[in-house]
């Protein structure tokens, strides 16, 4: 229609550059940047584009000489068209500052920020200072939110729509304000009273009205169900169900089930589901109108009056409006018949005011494939993880990260196994390159799935030189040593090794070599368990150490047939010889402990999976078996100890050799029994002592007993008496007397016979060169302990012999000698410090 009380104007900057408006079309909607397309005219035919492009501009719709509507924005497009006789045509696009966000895209990470906080930061970055947030509900922080190459505007809208935020614009002459809120119902209402409806033809209404009103209802999703997963609560499905509003005119069974719901906290699940459902039902009840009331603005509610259907006369909220206008005066040249007047109309989409309208959810960005990243952490640290083994990484695309513990959130790491307190664990270390994939392609759900070598992290062995080596090699935390499991697949030389640099400890299996990188010189075949530190082998149910052949593990791992046979034969031999010795006055043999041990070795594997049908064994015994022999050697000492018996059995010879002494001590009996051969005890250099300290010595022989001294003498002594008997004759030495008796003749043959006075054997020993027992006595003052020189004493020997002696200048007496221990009594005769008797037993 034509309305001569309307006028359109447009100025750029602060009113310094004005244009005549020829035509305009303004498209504006909730949650969309507006677009004002202007066709302009100016008497200037050479306008500097710098004065217009990317500059603020204000469009004003005047009604009755007063501004009825402002549209303020930034010039995004400017075109100079044809020039007429007096005027030049121009075209221009005016958009909000928010539209500039579409010009920028980025890769970056937001951590521990709520969506309102992210939007504020994003707009502040683009200097969108006229921004107002109206937040009525709690919005939980997002642990990790990524802008994955999409535009800043797409990020803004995606996050806002997910979180249930709507935005619209509020205008004045000098600015446009972006208003963002999580509740639509409480927002603005237009000024100036109700909007009128009139069904009269266009142009017949004296005031702005809506002359067309079409109301529709559409069958839409009735229920929204969403689920998501959190590894911290794996058994909780985080499922949320919501039913739509105003379902009276449609079925309620139309459910939309989405997974994942893109929320990790249950508290965010309901609002997320609610926003999505509202987006799906955004046009369930909608009205399409047309008219010429310029007050209709998206987001601003109005009351409708004058509609013939009473229930349509209610509060409505525009969600989309398209304004069009033509100002013929702005396009006039010099033609006298140019049309005059102004034309303006609008088309709009409305929803009831009480509807919490939300836009359709935007598709979430998807990462096309895995990405490379570097593990990071605090300075000076090598391993940085949390209780779940998660790590932090620095992506190559992240310009804001500082390669530290704040570069990302904690990111989960895929392991080969992950069980309940069991599985594989190898935490990626700081500086390692990792492969990061994304669950469901979601940029906000990274997961480390692998690791790769690179120039700064070389493989453990030079390649391809050592391509036959497979290894798991770790590095000492904050050190330079390593632990390693290495497999060598060299042809005909395969081996495996489990190694630790601590103590050079290792288990080598197979074809043993020195390290391949150092030449790989052979060093044996089989296995080697070695360390520079301590070692221990423990088996609680028994241990078999054997060199018995068992090719390719063809029998049970405790196959011990040979050692059991040898032990049984040894037990049999010990019993036979022991019993025979006992029957012939030898010391009795106790074979029970030996039999117990033999049975323990026999039953060593009973109860194991290959001997499960037999009685339980598993006694903690050790069996050593060497078909070719067992050698135990040490340059130091060898100790063999037993709490019960030590049974040593040899089917042939048992030989004991010592370079110096052989000492055998027994707490009870010692039995030596030679069943069929000799028993020899020989000292080659030193003396031989055969002594019974508390009892008797008996020498018995079925044949003869011979006693000889090839170089010196044979001495027989006794305290009580000595008796020699043979054939009824006897000789007895007793009490200093000699008695001879015989049933036959007494023959004495000698070259000379001498008869002298009495003598004692004890005193005669002092004249011997040496005897086994000798003593030197020193006489001392009892008080001062000083030696007493020149004191006469009387020494009384055990057999009654008496010797008078004198101490020398140092108080010493002459040496007293005997073949055995002998009691001695010393009596002081001369004057000295003490006259008391002193006795000494030796």
From Swiss-Prot:
UniProt cross-references to Gene3D superfamilies, sorted A to Z: 2.30.110.50, 4.10.220.110, Baseplate protein-like domains, Gp5 N-terminal domain
GO biological process: protein secretion by the type VI secretion system
Effect of loss of the gene: Deletion leads to a 75% loss of internalization of P.aeruginosa into host cell.
SUPFAM superfamilies: gp5 N-terminal domain-like, Phage fibre proteins, Phage tail proteins
Protein origin, superkingdom: Bacteria
Chain spans, region Disordered: 265-291
Family annotation (Pfam families): DUF2345, Phage_base_V, Phage_GPD, T6SS_Vgr
Cellular component GO terms, alphabetical: type VI protein secretion system complex
Family (UniProt): Belongs to the VgrG protein family.
Function: Part of the H2 type VI secretion system (H2-T6SS) specialized secretion system, which delivers several virulence factors in both prokaryotic and eukaryotic cells during infection. May form the spike at the tip of the elongating tube formed by haemolysin co-regulated protein 2a/Hcp2a. In turn, may allow the delivery of the Tle4 antibacterial toxin to target cells where it exerts its toxicity. Also promotes the release of VgrG2b toxin to the host cell.
UniProt name for this protein: Type VI secretion system spike protein VgrG2a
Source organism of the structure: Pseudomonas aeruginosa (strain ATCC 15692 / DSM 22644 / CIP 104116 / JCM 14847 / LMG 12228 / 1C / PRS 101 / PAO1)
Chain's gene name: vgrG2a
